Amino acid sequence: MRAQNNLTVEVDCHSLGSNECPSMTSSFSPMDSPTPTPTSIYSQGSLASPGWQDAGSYPGHAYERHTGTTPMRSAFRLAGMTSNENMAMSYGAMEAQERMPMPDFLSAYDDNVEHFWLPSDAPKTYETGTHSLPYPHTLPQCPPMVRSNYRPHAAYLPEAATNPCLSRSIFHHAERVPQSMSMGNMMPWIPQASESIAPQTIAPSQVGPVTPPPSYSEFPTSIQTFKTHSPTTPLRSCSIGTASGPDTPISRMSGGAADYLEDFQQSPPFRDGLNRLQRHPSRKMIRKQSSRQNMSLENLPSIIKQVQFKCKEPGCKGRFKRQEHLKRHMKSHSKEKPHVCWVPGCERAFSRSDNLNAHYTKTHSKRGGRNRYVATLDESSPDYDPDFRGQLTPDGRPIRGSTLDDPMPDTREYSVDGLDD
């Protein structure tokens, strides 16, 4: 295969005389070229040299060289390669001694290099043709990513993942690279290797209007204006805002929280919710307003007129919803009070039984009052017996076996000590 792929050299000597372009049969060395070559680029310190000049002569490849005093550009052409052959060689099919290690070709690229390799006998430049790519003669814009405080055992991302110049193979065709990824748009934003990035404090007065980069021209036309402001903190910032349109992530970034809050308050969902709250006040507010209105006599509701059961007693304004409630109320106006307190010495009468039971609970079941204490009506007493009807001791304890018709017992006969015996 090597015997078939011979290399020839074609030199454009239109501007030179016949005596200035003599033919030569000596082998070509990239170090002798007056113009920048890949080897001379590596010798400038940008990238590690792959050792092309140390390889000596190349077997199977014949080079022709034309020399002259005037600097000229040499072009090489791979003559023996047909149009249907692929330029890339299978990495697994190459011999071990022909595989070029990636750390020798690119500095700081020492891991995961299986996907990026160069054959040792690959040509240095190409002509513009079917299998051609204009090789950059100088690479001052793409310095290597310098690692400070290099630690050989520390894990880090390969340079191809961080350096945009190494994200694509250098042998890819130019038409495969999109316009947004071209070197012209990328180079002005890549810092030079000689520049040292140091933390700086920028005063608000030093922050001027920020102009968009060239790549922003490819953004949609919805971005019409670029807002700039002077931050209060020593940080450089810019914001991209939209003059109008729906809520987008870009509009959220514009102007900080204040501008976004204004846009949010003007959004249709916010306005609809605010109008809904204004149209439908809460129930608590309605209750408060109605209670304030009901406090005045002029705004009393007409519920009393709907009550049909009224008290017929002169001077009584009692009104009830049910008939039985009216009957119970009428007993309070009558002279009849059939429900009498059985406690000796009280004998208070009530027209209703529920009033009598309330009298027992509130009056005779508590100690220390002016009314007589009855132990049988106290739920916390051991003598509690609500059905007991009989005579009581002076301290309110029941006398078992006595009745209400019996005479009042003598206090000297029924003492507490005598009951305990």
Swiss-Prot record:
Q: What is this protein called?
A: C2H2 type master regulator of conidiophore development brlA
Q: Which GO terms describe its biological process?
A: conidium formation; sporulation resulting in formation of a cellular spore
GO function term, MF aspect, one: DNA-binding transcription factor activity, RNA polymerase II-specific
Q: Which PROSITE patterns match?
A: ZINC_FINGER_C2H2_1 (PS00028), ZINC_FINGER_C2H2_2 (PS50157)
Q: What does this protein do?
A: BrlA, abaA and wetA are pivotal regulators of conidiophore development and conidium maturation. They act individually and together to regulate their own expression and that of numerous other sporulation-specific genes. Binds promoters of target genes at brlA response elements (BREs) containing the conserved sequence 5'-(C/A)(A/G)AGGG(G/A)-3'.
A Pfam family this chain is assigned to: zf-C2H2
Q: What taxonomic lineage is listed for the species of origin? A: Eukaryota, Fungi, Dikarya, Ascomycota, Pezizomycotina
Q: Where are the zinc fingers (C2H2-type)?
A: 309-333, 339-364
Q: Which residues form a coiled coil?
A: none
Key words, A-Z: Activator, Conidiation, DNA-binding, Metal-binding, Nucleus, Repeat, Sporulation, Transcription, Transcription regulation, Zinc, Zinc-finger
Name the PANTHER family on file.
TRANSCRIPTIONAL REPRESSOR PROTEIN YY (PTHR14003), YY2 TRANSCRIPTION FACTOR (PTHR14003:SF19)
Q: Which GO terms describe its cellular component?
A: chromatin; nucleus; transcription regulator complex
Polar residues: which segments have biased composition?
A: 228-242
Q: Key word DNA-binding present in the record?
A: yes
Q: Gene3D superfamilies from the xrefs?
A: Classic Zinc Finger (3.30.160.60)
Q: Where does the record place it?
A: Nucleus
What ranges does the record list as Basic residues composition bias? 361-370
Entry's induction text? Expression is down-regulated by dioctatin A (DotA), a metabolite of Streptomyces.
Note down the stretches annotated as region Disordered: 228-247, 361-421
